Design a protein with these regions (language model features):
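Membrane-embedded alpha-helical hairpins and interfacial helices in multi-pass inner-membrane proteins
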Residues: 2-53, 95-97, 101, 136, ...
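Cytoplasmic-side transmembrane-helix entry/capping segments in multi-pass membrane proteins
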Residues: 72-82, 104-105, 142-146, 172-173
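Transmembrane alpha-helical segments of multi-pass membrane proteins
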Residues: 75-91, 174-182
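Interfacial aromatic-anchored transmembrane helix boundaries in multi-pass membrane proteins
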Residues: 88-103, 123-158
Length: 301
């Protein structure tokens, strides 16, 4: 029987767990469309702890499987912790218009280190930021998941932008950060919007069709969130334009240094004195190391 915890099987399991985190997150955002608000006035107070626990278990299991399969080094996990903590600290930085430095850090980390790193960095950074700012509540798991999607999508984009000239890569990432400024706000609003008390054109009720639901939410978003998110989107773009090139270069230098070093050696051969024959040069044919190959972790999904 094949070992279910072999490196190949474990790496595959880790990727499946990343997909599972995304599926659980989507289900968590859509759940209130089928569940009514509770009597306490906190519509997500009941299911939020369950979603938090489930996502936490999936993240920890995925990281454990990565370490078990040796697809991630202990140093890369430590780097993930440091980047997540630094990004969480940036949440304390209040920018004009309500922007925050946490999102540009998550986006650049994902672009530099890859999809898996961006996903987990986004999740952990929002948790750290919430602990520092006192922002722990039923909204936290939804903020963390949305931030994780920012980092993961930046990792996918990073595989394409690294082929561009550095200047244009930064411009592309700045535009991407600008779009996510609106996307993040539109996604996170769903943690409470379906269970708002009201029957007006800005609210949702079970009798609405899908098209009517989209129309009502669009009106709600334009009325309550668009201006705030526009400021955040602008902050993302400006920060990336100003610091993106230097931060990406620093991240990628670290990624190269932390990448596993694999050296291949040629099989040892019998020396000339043991075989009774000599080589043309009179030297023994000792094993010599082949050219080392560097496995760059940033290319891993």
């Amino acid at each position: 029987m094949a070992d279910l915890l072999s490196p190949t099987a474990t790496n595959r399991r880790s990727r499946l767990l990343m997909v599972a985190i995304t599926i659980v997150g989507i289900a968590g955002f859509l759940l209130p469309f089928w569940l009514p608000a509770d009597a306490s006035g906190q519509p997500r107070s009941a299911e939020a702890p369950m979603l938090t626990a489930l996502v936490a278990v999936l993240v920890l299991v995925a990281l454990a499987l990565d370490l078990r399969s040796h697809t991630r080094s202990a140093a890369s996990i430590a780097l993930l912790g440091m980047v997540s903590a630094a990004a969480g600290l940036l949440r304390l930085l209040d920018l004009p218009g309500g922007g925050s430095g946490v999102f540009f850090a998550i986006l650049l980390a994902g672009a530099a280190f890859g999809t898996w790193f961006g996903l987990y960095a986004g999740i952990f950074a929002m948790v750290v930021g919430a602990l520092l700012t006192g922002g722990v509540g039923p909204w936290l798991p939804y903020q963390a998941l949305a931030a994780g999607w920012i980092g993961a999508s930046a990792g996918l984009l990073g595989h394409l932008t690294r082929r561009l000239a550095p200047r244009w890569e930064v411009v592309a990432l700045a535009g991407f950060g600008w779009l996510w400024g609106f996307g993040y706000g539109a996604i996170v609003n769903l943690w409470f919007w379906p269970v708002r008390v009201g029957t007006g054109e800005l609210d949702w009720n079970p009798g609405l069709s899908v098209a009517e639901t989209v129309q009502h939410y669009w009106r709600f978003y334009l009325t309550t969130s668009f201006a705030w998110d526009a400021a955040g989107a602008l902050a993302n773009a400006v920060l990336i334009l100003l610091t993106g090139r230097a931060v990406l270069e620093a991240f990628r230098r670290v990624a190269h240094r932390l990448a596993p070093q694999i050296e291949f050696y040629t099989p040892a051969t019998t020396s000339a004195s043991e075989t009774g024959s000599s080589s043309p040069s009179g030297a023994s044919a000792d094993a010599r190391p082949a050219t080392p190959h560097v496995a760059d972790e940033r290319t891993a999904p």
